[in-house]
């Protein structure tokens, strides 16, 4: 039947086939919280929020802010872990740490230098592990970066693999 409106008429004999493809991970920040939470990983079971093994209170606070921010995107079950980096044996690792506590192998993945003030947030892939690294010299910058990632409208504007976050933004 013809209908002047922009509607599709579905009858009892209509057959619909709907397909979707899983996008490749582009390592861009606007995709956050993907791949930490996705259709293939709805409860975060393949992801971990990790702090340095020598974590202090500021690192733990920022990590908890990230966990809370992702809570709305998780399915009813939350299987994502909060752990020390040495225990983060997951495919996707969201790392929060002060530069002085960050292992050299993670610092070597960064393509930009960690600023003296503020934080560097960068998506990188190392082998089979996808990382979101949040590294700062100042404690307050870690919470500021976590607040940025908890704001979906700000994250949607980050069409790059890294950004700098200033304290007080």
Named regions from a protein language model:
Residues 1-169:
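Solvent-exposed alpha-helical segments and adjacent loops
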């Amino acid at each position: 039947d013809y209908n002047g409106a922009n509607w599709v008429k579905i009858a009892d004999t209509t057959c619909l086939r709907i397909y979707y493809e899983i996008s490749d991970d582009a390592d861009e920040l606007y995709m956050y919280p993907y791949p930490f939470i996705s259709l293939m990983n709805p409860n975060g079971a393949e992801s971990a929020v990790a702090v340095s093994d020598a974590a202090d209170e500021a690192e733990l606070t920022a990590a908890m802010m990230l966990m809370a921010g992702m809570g709305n995107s998780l399915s009813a079950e939350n299987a994502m872990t909060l752990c020390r980096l040495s225990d983060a044996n997951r495919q996707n690792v969201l790392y929060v740490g002060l530069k002085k506590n960050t292992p050299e192998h993670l610092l070597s993945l960064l393509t930009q230098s960690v600023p003296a003030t503020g934080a560097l947030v960068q998506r990188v892939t190392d082998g089979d592990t996808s990382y979101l690294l949040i590294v700062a010299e100042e404690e307050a910058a870690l919470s500021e970066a976590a607040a940025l990632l908890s704001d979906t409208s700000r994250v949607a504007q980050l069409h790059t693999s890294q950004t700098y976050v200033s304290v007080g933004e």
